[in-house]
Regions:
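Positively charged, solvent-exposed patches that mediate nucleic-acid binding
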Residues: 1-132
Length: 132
């Protein structure tokens, strides 16, 4: 079965409580210019195994247009490669909460973000695999 390349509202991490837990647990991996914070939680009423949020520093990119562009690029990379993530996370009871943060000081193009995202996912799975 093929997964649609969509990004639904239920896949977005919006809960302040869940986002707070991400930073409290401080589990993260990085591949410059991206860093990902992650936490495993019990799956609530969501049918998706992953909830994700995107962030770009206002301190680094002053203009909202530039911040939004980087968020859109990260969203697009996630959307195109989420089927790989979902295949590896086939748990019925656990959900993976992710916060993808752009930490670079200079603008990046889609190809760079995609390459670093894939490298980041390999690092993430290397850390998650021993725990499960």
């Amino acid at each position: 079965m093929s997964l649609p390349n969509t990004f639904s509202k239920e896949e977005r991490l919006k809960s302040r409580k869940q986002i707070g837990l991400l930073f409290k647990n401080r589990q993260s991996v990085g591949s410059y210019p991206l860093r990902i914070f992650w936490a495993e939680t019990e799956r609530e009423a969501s049918k998706y195994p992953v909830a994700i949020s995107f962030s770009v520093s206002k301190r680094i990119f002053k203009q909202a247009v530039k911040r939004n562009r980087h968020k859109r690029l990260m969203l697009e990379v996630f959307r195109l490669h989420k089927h790989e993530l979902y295949e590896k996370l086939n748990s019925e009871t656990k959900q993976l909460n992710l916060m993808l943060i752009y930490v670079g000081k200079e603008p990046a193009d889609f190809a760079t973000i995609e390459k670093k995202y894939l490298k980041l996912m390999d690092k993430l799975f290397a850390q998650i695999a021993p725990q499960t």
